[in-house]
Every structure is written in C-alpha cells, then in structure tokens.
C-alpha cells in the first residue's frame, strides 16, 4: 500500500552517528504541509514509535540534531499528538542549544521550482541556533557598514499567540540541510523574540542565501506592520531588512572559499566547475541582484568630488520610463579630456619644474612647467623631476602614487557609500571611506581603487592648439636627453641618446627651427631624416659610442616612415620580422608623434608603419585624439603599447561593442579610465586662481553677409530649384538616404555658386564623397541664356573701338563724382563708355542701387545708359601709340596705362568684398599681414589672380597641398619676413593645410571665404594666428552669402556647438546624421 506524503521540501540529511540515522525506507502517517505538497511518493512500512515520531518532526521542520530530537522525544512521545507539540515548541520556543550542549541543528529547505536554477548550496552547512550568528566564517567580524535597506513582504509559517510589537526587532536565519541541492532551495526564516514567525519569499531567498553562505553581508530585520490580531499561517506582513557589508565582504582572494560547493548537476551542467568558480558565480549573482534591489548605481568616472552623480537616477526606475539613447559627442569627450588636469596626481606635482639652463634657452610658462612635471612623472623620471623642481619637492605620498599609477580596471565600477555612517562594531577600525569599488562580473568588492599597472613610459599630450605642445616636448627632451640606464638587451641596437620625432611634412622645418631656437647646448644636435638627408646606416650613426655627433633629436615625416615600411615589408623573414634597415634598424630612446591623430585608423599603412618602430618611451601630441570614432583612441593605445588596451579583442569587448549596443555611460567610463593616467589636456579658456592659463590678445569674429549680384542670384536660384525638387522627391519616396550622394552634389553646386561661378563643374575637393563633375546640358543652356540677357557690347570689334577711343579722354587728376576721391588710383579706377571715371566699388554700388529701385541704369554724370558689362579698368602697364592708331585710325601718343574690359563674373561678390577689406586695411594699417582661408584650392587660384589684378600693393602667397616641402618652407619664410614698404602680405591657405601645426602669429587678420560643416575645423584654422606669440588683437571676418545655403550651414554649426559634434560608431550612422543636417539645409 502506498500513501502520499505531502511536504514542501525534500529534507537534506545531516551526517549523524550510525545509531541515529533514520531508516530511509521507513514511513510515517501522512501530514499536511503548510504550503506546497510534494509529488514524491514513499512506500509505507511498519516502523517503531520513535522512528514515526522522528519522521513526523522531520516531515515538518526537516532534519534536526540527534540531541534535540532525543530531547523532544523524551518530552512529548507519550502525549497524544506529541509530534505536533514538539513542532510547536521548535517553531515558537526553540530549545536552548547551550543548555543542551549542541552546536547546531539541521535545517529544512523548500523544493525550488525546476525552472529556477540560481546558485549552488554548500553541503554540510550548519547554522548556529543562536539567531545572532548569521554566518559560519571563522574570521571574526571586525566592522560592518550599512549599504541599504529592503522592504520585503514575508509570510507567516505558524500561528502566533500574540501580536508583534512595533517596531518589532527580528532576526533572519538561513537554514539548510545536508541533502539540499540546486533544485532544493533553503529557507530564510524570520524570528521574533527567539521564535519563528515567518519566512521570506523564494526570490529573495535566492538572493540572500549566498550572502549568508559566503559571509558577504549581515542583516538586521524589523517588522513594520502591526498585526491587529495574532498571525495565522499564510498571513503576510512587511519587514525592513538593513543590509551591512563587512570586512569579509572585501576579501581580496576570491579564488578559494572555506565553504565547499556542491557541484551536482541541475538544469545546467556545472560538472566542470570548480568550487572556487561556483563560489564566484554565487557571489556575482547575489551582489549584482542585491545592488539592483537596493538601487545602488555606479558613479560616473569624472572625479572624486563631492557632487558626483549616479549614472542613472535612483529616484526613477529606468525600467519604468523609456529614455532616448544619448549620443556620445565630442563636447562630452572634451569634458573628459579636460577633467584629467584636475586629477589629484596632477595637483600633487611641482609647478616650478624648469629644464636645465645649459640645455634649454627659453623660459616656460607656469602651466608648461606643470606639464613638464607630468611628462617627467609619466616617464618615471622622479629623481630628475625633484632635481629640476627647485624647492617644490614631491611628497612621499605623491611619489608613491606616481610609482603605482595605472589605469582603472574596466571590470570594476565605482560606488559611493549610500549613508554617511562610519563602520561599526570595532572602534579601532576607522572606516570612513566615501567610495568603494565592485566588480559585477565576479561579485568582488574593494575599498581600494583597482588598477591595471602598465610599463608604459609616455602618454598623450593633448593641449589645445596654440598652447605650445612643441616647446613643452622639447623641454622634456632637453631635461632627459638620453637614457641614463640603457637596457642591457634588445633585438635591435639601442639608440639611447636619440629621440625620433615623426611629423607631417609641412611641419618638418618648423620643428627643426623650434629646436634651434630653444637649444642652448652646442653638443646637442638635431638631424633631419628626409629626402636626400636620410641616413642609410642608423645603427652606426646613432649607436656607435665613438661617434661624437649622435643627434639627440632626429626628425622625420609620416611619409618617410611609410615609404621605408612599404619597401621593407616585401622582405620580411620567416618570423614576419622586418629587415633591420633604416628607421627599423634601431630601437630609439624616445619616439614622439606630432599630430598623432594621423594614425587613428589602425588599418592604414601609415599606422602599421609607425607601430613597428621601437623605442623605450613613446609620446603622442594631438589636439584631436578623437576625430570620428571612439576606436580612434585604440590606434593611439596600440602605438603606446598600453597594456591591456593595445589588445584589440580587449578593446572591442569593453569599448567598441558596448558603444555599438548604446551602453553610452559604461563606454565613457571605460574611456575615461583609459585616459586618466596617460592623458593631459589644457585649454586656452581654462583658468587657474581666476586667471587664464595663458594671456592672449582679444579675438573678434564677425560675420559679414553679402548679397548676390544678378548673375549669381539667377544661377543660385536655378540650382536651388533643382536641389529642392530632388530633396522633396527623396522625402516623398522615403528614399532620402539612398539619394544621399545626389543631394550632396546639389549642395556642392550651391556652395560653389556662393563662392564663384567658375567653380561650377569642377571636382569636389573636400567632402567625404568625391563627386565627379556632371556634364549637364541643361546647365550649359542656362548659362548661355544668362549671357544673352546681359547688356554687353555687340562684338569684340565694338569693344576695341570704344576702348581705344577712351585713351585720350582719361586725365591724371580724375575725380570720382560719387565719393569725390581725387585722384582715383589706377588700381581702383573704372571708365564708362561715355568717358566718365569712377571708383569701381562706387559705380557698382550705384548700379546695384538702381537695380533695387527698378530704375534704368544710367551714368551719374551724363545720364547715358551704362552696364557693369560695359566698364573698362586700368592696369599699370604701358600702351604703345601705334596700337591705338591701328584701331582708331588717328595719331596717338604712348600712354603709361592700359585699358581692359571689366568682367564682373570673373570677380565674385565675395572676392569683391575681400578686396574692399584689403584696400581699407592697406590705407589704415600698412605693412599688415593677412590669412585668407578657403576649402577649395581652385577657389584660392581664382582669388590669387584677382588680388594680383586688384592692386599692386598686395603681396600674395598661396599655400596648399600642391606645394613640395622646400617650396612650403621658402613661402612661409617669405611671408613671415617683416614688411617695410607699406604693402599688405596676403597668405592664401587651404583649410586642410592650415589646420595642421602652422604657426602664423605674424598675421593678425583672417578672412574665411566659405563656411565648413564642423565649427571645430574653422576654430583650429583660426588658432593658427590666435596662439602663443600673438601680440595684437585678432580680427576674423567670415563672408556669408545672404539668404543662401551658407546661412543654413551657420545654423548647423550652432547646433553642433550646442549638442556636440556626433561621434558615430559606424559609417552608415554618420550618414544618417548628415541627412538630419541636410533636412535643416532645405528648410524654408
């Protein structure tokens, strides 16, 4: 006969003396469970009264100690329903274990649903009957600290004979039995006045039980709701549990555990899991869930200031409200960069560090001295730092911190103790830390910042453009010119006295010039490794101790490194090593990359060529370490050999993938932890003690809006109509992104018309997509129609007849009847067909005014009809009399000037505005120097020719990517020469070439001929003149065509300044963001 034994747990047996072990085949009369009946069945057999009594007890409360069982049997076995009385005593008034001289009793566990597998129970786990003992760790409790509190709805497990006092102090006890398995959860019971009153829900049991078992936390409970009548079985009541972390919670060695872990199989196969691994899994599960339930959030990794904020607010559950995923932007990144100069490490460094006078001729500014201290500390030259810092010595604490400096482990997050309470229980422990750290991957906790130490001696100097990164770097080189402790072994000869500096070609001679300017030691030599100056046997010239002319600095270009790498790559040996030739034949003392963002793409040959250069110390100088992607930083860390971030799989795991998964805060925390010890950035707007780091003259930027002339306006409107039609069609069809390239073509045309109509049809020079010039029949017809509608001379014969007849009517003392200027300079004079002379700007303004009034265009003097296409200008070149006689059939003398037909389309409205500014500058401030910026090299060509025609007082230089190295150097030297003849020197500079490393402080005026999408690109160009060394107020004029696409581009620039310039993870995402900007361009 079989009977069903109903019970809510399967008892786990404790190891007992052989005479006390219950017969596993014995049975008992069925008892009703308090909760869920078990489906297990056992056969009924005849047993002794003692066995039946024990079975009845075990069926309700689980296995208990043999001594306790013996005590209960002796007391209640002769009574009717004795087992029930025994259970009541166990549940309401447990026996005193000290009196019974018993260490522990076995505990019962409820059967966990088979779909829930959370953690492994430790076997043979014993629980002291004393409720004050929550764990069995042999380590004494030294301190505990409140981490938070929980409100939990508990369930009464037995009828109570009295109400619970409020507040009702209670105890939690974690009880488990010998046979508890993954499928058999233990119960965490609630005790009040030493009697059990209930248990907590199973989901909470799964979280709290490992905290008990692994000695991670201790708990204090209080009953919050008063029961008006006694509790009945199954009643609910609310308890508050205060959770305390203890000193054992922060144990550093988690590879071993005192509590053995049962590795029996469950729904998951943990058969290959060690005890240590199981303990870590339990700990991770419990810690992460506890922090989640307590709403404890990690801090942002900005700093250790008092006003730190949580990554997500504790007031709002992130699961309740949907928030848009924030975009990471360059403005946020700049905030991260800037925070590095506020590090405690930086604050503890001397601010008086000065390079040796016998080596370095210049005086450093205060912030440069501070930066030099940081660079020496990064190179671990602490003795040199103290020697050069005069009386400002390092404290022992600062020295220790510098020696142990490392990057924060990305697996860890920083937390703030949620309550301002000190640790309790042991007054000798001064636990007043504000922060602690947690590793949610394994549940490890730490009071000390977990760092990954690196052997890197170097870093990234990312000071804003114009703060003197070059001088700061040369100060470092002159402070430590060579390695005082050369490495004993290296697979390449060690050039222990030479620093290799890799620069863009345009900066090669500038670096050499800066070195010579600051060098104060005749034995210190700088050598160029470029072109014909390349040394073939570097191993001898740099490593031979007999060579007295070993350079302390050798400067080369990225192109030179790439060329050598490409040539040698074809000759790699069986191990994949490059031949030891040229730059790859030695290991340098130090390598410095100027404009280091040139290697930001790790897949380019330039980056790969630089990776294989060897040195003991490495530095990167860049004002823009991130250009488009966060992965730009990876290439920098790879060059620096910043372990472990130079391993791409590591980088991808903690930076690339989380960013792609929109885990913005997590990614930024990791990026900050990477940059923190190796990165320094200062800005010109940054202040110290209320004063800017560097005192620069004022900078004034003004926008001058210019109106289109007739032809420009017609042409612009025609292109605009076509562009808007294409955009509207893309919106209507929902394929705007697919029409991206076509729309960019239209935008390009509109921008070209704003600059100069001659740019129409040329290949685009600046955008990401290279757009071939379309041969548009409609466009050619339109241009032809414009010319047909212009009032022009009938033919070339008519032009010459009119022009040559004017020679005898032009007087030297000509007066402009509009502005009354006398005489009118030839370079500004214009002659009408009716032989009246005016200033060019005056007559053009007059004609434009007549157009606005919709009146006929007439000569101001004689009222004859005139047109800007029938005006003649004067060159300062002689004209022979026989040339004139040939056309007018009359005698004529020689003249000192030459007339030519003015072409208003040759000089666009913008160029005319530029000429007006330059002429005004010449008259007000002769000997001035000016920079003119544009993105289009072909536009600069047009400007150059127009300026040469406009005035002989203009000296024009043009600097773009088409110049070779020698021509660039000569051009800049000529431009920087002082002017003494009253003329104006004008440097035409492409925006791309002007954004790299040039020092143009001899100029104080700049003109931006066309806007760019990114305001930061324009700012970098302007910083070429507004930087250290500038002594005059800088004025910048930005020419913008009125009511054009350029005014919309200004809106986009302003938008980027407000919300940041987006750094997208993928190319497609960047294109989508550009579409948003395109929509702004086409807004009416």
UniProtKB/Swiss-Prot annotation:
Chain positions recorded as ATP binding sites: 463-470
Residue span of region Disordered: 11-51
Superkingdom of source: Eukaryota
UniProt EC number: 3.6.4.-
TM annotation in the entry: none
CDD domains reported in the protein's UniProt record: DEXDc_SHPRH-like, SF2_C_SNF
Location(s) in or outside the cell: Cytoplasm; Nucleus
Helicase ATP-binding domain boundaries: 450-643
Motif (DEGH box): 594-597
Keywords tagged on the record: ATP-binding, Cytoplasm, DNA damage, DNA repair, DNA-binding, Helicase, Hydrolase, Metal-binding, Nucleotide-binding, Nucleus, Zinc, Zinc-finger
Major location (coarse): cytoplasm
GO molecular function, one term: helicase activity
Helicase C-terminal domain segment(s): 913-1071
Zinc finger (RING-type): 816-863
SUPFAM superfamilies: P-loop containing nucleoside triphosphate hydrolases (SSF52540), RING/U-box (SSF57850)
Top-level class of the enzyme under EC nomenclature: hydrolase
Any one annotated GO CC term: cytoplasm
GO terms, biological process: DNA repair
Protein's job: Probable helicase, member of the UBC2/RAD6 epistasis group. Functions with DNA repair protein RAD18 in error-free postreplication DNA repair. Involved in the maintenance of wild-type rates of instability of simple repetitive sequences such as poly(GT) repeats. Seems to be involved in maintaining a balance which acts in favor of error-prone non-homologous joining during DNA double-strand breaks repairs.
Family in the record: Belongs to the SNF2/RAD54 helicase family.
Protein name: DNA repair protein RAD5
Source organism of the structure: Candida albicans (strain SC5314 / ATCC MYA-2876) (Yeast)
């Amino acid at each position: 006969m079989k009977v069903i034994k109903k019970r809510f747990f399967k008892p786990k047996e404790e190891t007992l003396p052989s005479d006390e072990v219950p017969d596993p085949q014995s049975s008992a009369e069925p008892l009703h469970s308090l909760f869920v009946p078990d489906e297990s069945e056992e056969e009924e057999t005849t047993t002794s009264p003692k066995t039946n009594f024990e079975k009845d007890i075990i069926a309700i409360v689980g296995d208990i100690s043999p001594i306790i069982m013996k005590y209960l049997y002796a007391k209640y076995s002769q009574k009717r329903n004795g087992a029930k009385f025994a259970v009541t005593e166990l549940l309401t008034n447990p026996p005193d274990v000290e009196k019974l001289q018993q260490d522990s009793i076995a505990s019962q566990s409820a059967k966990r649903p088979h779909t829930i597998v959370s953690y492994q129970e430790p076997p043979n786990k014993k629980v002291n009957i004393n409720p004050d003992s929550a764990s069995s760790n042999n380590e004494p409790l030294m301190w505990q600290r409140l981490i938070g509190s929980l409100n939990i709805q508990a369930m009464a497990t037995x009828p109570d004979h009295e109400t619970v006092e409020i507040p009702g102090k209670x105890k939690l006890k974690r009880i488990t039995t010998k046979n508890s398995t993954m499928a058999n959860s233990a119960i965490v019971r609630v005790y009040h006045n030493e009697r059990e009153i209930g248990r907590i829900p199973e989901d909470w049991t799964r979280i709290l039980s490992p905290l008990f078992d692994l000695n991670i936390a201790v708990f204090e409970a209080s009953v919050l709701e008063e029961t008006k009548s006694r509790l009945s079985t199954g009643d609910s009541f609310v308890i508050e549990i205060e959770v305390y972390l203890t000193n054992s919670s922060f144990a550093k060695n988690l590879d071993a555990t005192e509590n053995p872990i049962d590795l029996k199989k469950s729904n998951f196969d943990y058969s290959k899991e060690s005890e240590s691994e199981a303990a870590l899994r339990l700990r991770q599960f419990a810690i992460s869930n506890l922090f989640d339930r307590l709403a404890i959030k990690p801090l942002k990794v900005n700093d250790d200031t008092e006003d730190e904020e949580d990554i997500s607010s504790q007031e709002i559950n992130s699961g309740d409200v949907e928030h848009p995923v924030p975009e990471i932007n360059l403005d946020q990144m700049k905030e991260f960069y800037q925070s590095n100069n506020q590090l405690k490490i930086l604050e503890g460094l001397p601010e008086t560090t000065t390079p040796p006078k016998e080596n370095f001729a210049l005086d450093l500014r205060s912030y440069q001295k501070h930066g030099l201290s940081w660079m020496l500390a990064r190179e671990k030259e602490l003795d040199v730092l103290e020697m050069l810092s005069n009386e400002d010595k390092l404290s022992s604490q600062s020295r220790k911190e510098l020696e142990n400096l490392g990057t924060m482990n990305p697996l860890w997050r920083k937390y703030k103790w949620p309550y301002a309470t000190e640790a309790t229980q042991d007054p000798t422990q001064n636990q007043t830390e504000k922060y602690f750290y947690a590793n949610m991957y394994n549940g490890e906790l730490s009071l000390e910042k977990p760092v990954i130490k690196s052997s890197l001696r170097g870093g990234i100097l990312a000071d804003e453009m114009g703060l003197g990164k070059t001088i700061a770097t040369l100060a470092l080189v002159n402070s430590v010119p060579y390695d005082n402790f050369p490495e004993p072994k290296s697979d390449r000869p060690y050039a222990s006295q030479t620093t290799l500096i890799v620069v863009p070609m345009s900066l090669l001679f500038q670096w050499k010039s800066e070195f010579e300017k600051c060098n104060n030691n005749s034995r210190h030599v700088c050598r160029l490794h470029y072109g014909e100056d390349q040394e073939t046997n570097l191993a001898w010239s740099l490593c031979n101790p007999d060579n007295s002319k070993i350079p302390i600095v050798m400067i080369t270009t990225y192109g030179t490194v790439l060329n050598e790498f490409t040539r040698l790559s074809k000759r790699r040996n069986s191990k994949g090593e490059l031949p030891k030739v040229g730059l790859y034949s030695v290991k340098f003392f130090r390598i410095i990359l100027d404009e280091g963002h040139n290697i930001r793409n790790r897949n380019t040959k330039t980056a790969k060529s630089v990776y294989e250069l060897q040195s003991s110390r490495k530095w990167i100088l860049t004002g823009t370490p991130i250009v488009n992607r966060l992965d730009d930083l990876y290439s920098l860390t790879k060059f620096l050999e910043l372990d472990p971030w130079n391993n791409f799989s590591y980088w991808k795991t903690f930076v690339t993938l989380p960013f792609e998964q929109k885990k913005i805060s997590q990614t930024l925390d990791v990026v900050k932890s990477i940059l923190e010890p190796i990165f320094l950035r200062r800005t010109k707007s940054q202040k110290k003690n209320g004063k800017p780091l560097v005192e620069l003259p004022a900078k004034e930027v003004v926008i001058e809006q210019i109106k289109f002339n007739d032809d420009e306006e017609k042409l612009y409107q025609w292109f605009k109509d076509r562009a808007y039609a294409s955009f509207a069609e893309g919106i209507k069809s929902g394929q705007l992104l697919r029409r991206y390239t076509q729309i960019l073509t239209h935008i390009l045309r509109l921008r070209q018309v704003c600059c100069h109509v001659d740019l129409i049809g040329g290949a685009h020079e600046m955008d990401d997509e290279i757009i071939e010039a379309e041969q548009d029949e409609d466009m050619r017809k339109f241009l032809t129609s414009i010319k047909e509608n212009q009032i022009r001379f009938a033919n070339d014969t008519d032009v010459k007849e009119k022009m040559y007849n004017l020679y005898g009517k032009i007087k030297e003392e000509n007066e402009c009847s509009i502005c009354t200027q006398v005489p009118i300079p030839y370079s500004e004079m214009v002659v009408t067909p009716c032989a009246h002379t005016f200033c060019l700007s005056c007559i053009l303004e007059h004609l434009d005014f007549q157009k606005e009034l919709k009146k006929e265009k007439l000569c101001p003097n004689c009222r004859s009809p005139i047109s800007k296409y029938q005006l003649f200008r004067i060159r300062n070149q002689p004209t022979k009399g026989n040339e004139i006689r040939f056309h007018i059939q009359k005698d004529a003398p020689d003249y000192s000037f030459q007339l030519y037909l003015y072409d208003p389309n040759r000089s666009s409205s913008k160029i005319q505005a530029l000429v007006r500014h330059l002429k005004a500058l010449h008259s007000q401030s002769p000997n001035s120097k000016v920079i003119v910026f544009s993105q289009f090299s072909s536009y600069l060509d047009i400007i150059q020719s127009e300026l040469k025609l406009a005035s002989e007082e203009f000296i024009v230089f043009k600097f773009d990517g088409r110049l070779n190295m020698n021509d660039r150097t000569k051009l800049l030297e000529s431009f920087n020469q002082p002017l003494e003849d009253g003329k104006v020197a004008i440097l035409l500079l492409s925006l791309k070439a002007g954004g790299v490393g040039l020092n143009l402080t001899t100029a104080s005026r700049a003109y931006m001929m066309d806007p760019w999408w990114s305001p930061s690109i324009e700012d970098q160009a302007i910083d070429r003149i507004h930087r250290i060394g500038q002594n005059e107020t800088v004025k910048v004029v930005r020419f913008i065509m009125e009511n054009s696409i350029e005014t919309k581009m200004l809106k986009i620039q302003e938008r980027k300044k407000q919300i940041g310039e987006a750094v997208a993870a993928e190319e497609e995402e960047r294109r989508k963001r550009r579409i948003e900007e395109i929509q702004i361009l086409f807004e009416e």
